[in-house]
């Protein structure tokens, strides 16, 4: 989320310059957006990589799957940068951009599968997880970590525990493969 909020003020502050240079045919909008994205990318991806690396090893997740984990985190940060730049470009000023920025994140968070089991959504809302980028991030991270894992359950009722990672994925209603989720 910090990757998105960091770029929300970008375009409103530079609109006058951008419009002047576009009018002078110095470059087109796509070139400016691509250049801005490339400049903002390392600045906003690095904190996610550092934080993710610390958390991954501290929590003790599967060391063999760390590379996939980092790739998923970087894609999430890049998605947030793009979303932030899009909101920034659409907003007439920085204040509006700061107020509109959290809205797509909140919708994505609510329908991302972490707080609500996506299998329990009413029929009218079943389409919302598909537009939630956080659903794809969460699903990818869960699939990455739980595929091929087995657990031992020491409870009196063994059905209370998931015996395999695939059972965890089934309970979360994640039916895609890692490649499909990414």
Task: Report the location of each language-model feature.
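Membrane-spanning alpha-helical segments of multipass transporters and channels
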Residues: 1-182
